[in-house]
């Protein structure tokens, strides 16, 4: 029996919601920068009998019996992660990027220690010291931002803040920063103030794996990431380290420090994704992600819409909508009405609240997986510009939606193979 047919019989309500979500993904242009489309193989691993197995501990050091096969799977995931990022140690158990970060904090910090990360409104992340997050409640968080003129990192200012505040941990890596990160400069500052250096590469992990962005491991004490986004795996976390002995501290902070049993079905899916990312085709994919982002940015700029920092080096294109006198909240609603999913986002020195914002964040990873090339992304850019520059024109709204649906038909999600894979 088809798996989804079985679900439809046992729980038709959930089955209908899943089918509705599948239809939404097929008929919308996914431009949320933190999303991607995992392969059918990754999803099959997630939906396997491994979901039944409890396996507290590390491979060969479990607290439960019957772990011989999940040990093999987890060891393979670790080996592939180490090879992919040229690391000497890896822990594949974190359930998310946020939990990977929490495990690092538990290993390196005491409550009240000073941590230093990018201001959330400039492109940082909640887990880098935001006052609404554990990282900002348990630790003394100080923040750096970007240069007001260039919207790029200002290392002179970062050094000044570090010298003044003497953080125990400096965090680099961001959720809305479209430029290359100079990890070596961060290392120099960390050494000067005696701080640990952590890189959170959740957004750029796939580009790092493809050697299209500098690898932080030669410079950072520890690296965390998610396994979805540009890495195109299941939703999960990963911790990497260049020093195997140092890495053992993080093993203990994952389990029993912050988690119980690992999700072995997700770890299997991570192993599959790491294996996919080790193939030459993945480098081609990552190259296309960047090419597409540059075309998307240049198309929008040509229509009079400002892009934060004037362009992009990765998959992120961050629109500064002050250039067209619009808020991110309104822009999000406008593109959503024509089947484009994105997210409102603060821009550096944003006068609006986080619930309104002056920015719209776009990303090219998901549609590149779907097969979109530069020509297609030029079309996407024109559609977005048409919609944002004509917010009250119902005719243009209808035309934009028709163009979106035509693109979805030209680049079908999973090329129609999804149904066949789950029989």
Swiss-Prot record:
Cofactor(s) needed for function: pyridoxal 5'-phosphate
One biological process term in Gene Ontology: glycine biosynthetic process from serine
Record's subcellular location: Cytoplasm
Main location: cytoplasm
Site (Plays an important role in substrate specificity) residue list: 228
Positions of post-translational N6-(pyridoxal phosphate)lysine modification: 229
Keyword field contains Transferase: yes
A GO term for molecular function: glycine hydroxymethyltransferase activity
Keyword Transferase (UniProt): yes
Pfam families: SHMT (PF00464)
Catalytic activity entry: (6R)-5,10-methylene-5,6,7,8-tetrahydrofolate + glycine + H2O = (6S)-5,6,7,8-tetrahydrofolate + L-serine
Subunit structure: Homodimer.
Protein name per Swiss-Prot or TrEMBL: Serine hydroxymethyltransferase
Gene responsible for this protein: glyA
């Amino acid at each position: 029996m088809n798996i989804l047919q079985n679900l439809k019989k046992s729980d038709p309500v959930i089955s209908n919601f899943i089918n509705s979500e599948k239809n939404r993904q097929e008929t919308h242009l996914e431009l949320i920068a933190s999303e991607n489309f995992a392969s059918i193989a990754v999803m099959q691993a997630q939906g396997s009998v491994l979901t039944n197995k409890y396996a507290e501990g590390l491979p060969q050091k479990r607290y439960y019996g019957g772990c011989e096969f999940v040990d093999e799977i987890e060891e393979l995931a670790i080996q592939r992660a180490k090879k992919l990022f040229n690391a000497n140690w890896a822990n594949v158990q974190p359930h998310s990027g946020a939990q990977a970060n929490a495990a690092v904090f538990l290993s390196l910090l005491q409550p009240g220690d000073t941590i230093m990360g990018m201001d959330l409104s400039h492109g940082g992340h909640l887990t880098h010291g935001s006052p609404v997050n554990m990282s900002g409640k348990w630790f003394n968080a100080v923040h750096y931002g970007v240069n007001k003129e260039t919207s790029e990192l200002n290392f002179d200012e970062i050094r000044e803040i570090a010298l003044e505040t003497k953080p125990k941990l400096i965090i680099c890596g961001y959720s809305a920063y479209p430029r290359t990160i100079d990890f070596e400069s961060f290392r120099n500052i960390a050494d000067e103030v005696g701080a640990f250096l952590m890189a959170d590469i959740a957004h750029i992990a796939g580009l790092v794996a493809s050697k299209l962005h500098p690898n932080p491991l030669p410079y950072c004490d520890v690296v965390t990431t998610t396994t979805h986004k540009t890495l195109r795996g299941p939703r999960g976390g990963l911790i990497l380290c260049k020093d195997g002995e140092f890495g053992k501290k993080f093993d203990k902070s994952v389990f029993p420090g912050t988690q119980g049993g690992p999700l072995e079905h997700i770890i299997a899916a991570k192993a599959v994704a790491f294996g996919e990312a080790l193939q030459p085709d993945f480098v081609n994919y990552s190259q296309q992600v960047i090419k597409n982002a540059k075309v998307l940015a240049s198309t929008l700029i040509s229509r009079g819409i400002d892009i934060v920092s004037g362009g992009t080096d990765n998959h992120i294109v961050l629109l500064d909508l002050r250039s067209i006198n619009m808020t991110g909240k309104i822009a999000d609603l406008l593109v959503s009405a024509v089947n484009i999913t994105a997210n409102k986002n603060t821009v550096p020195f944003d006068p609006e609240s986080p619930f309104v914002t002056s920015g719209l964040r776009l990303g090219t990873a998901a549609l590149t997986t779907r097969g979109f090339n530069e020509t297609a992304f030029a079309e996407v850019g024109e559609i977005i510009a048409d919609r944002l520059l004509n917010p009250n024109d119902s005719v243009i709204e209808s035309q934009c939606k028709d163009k979106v649906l035509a693109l979805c038909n030209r680049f079908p999600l999973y090329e129609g193979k999804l149904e066949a894979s789950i029989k």
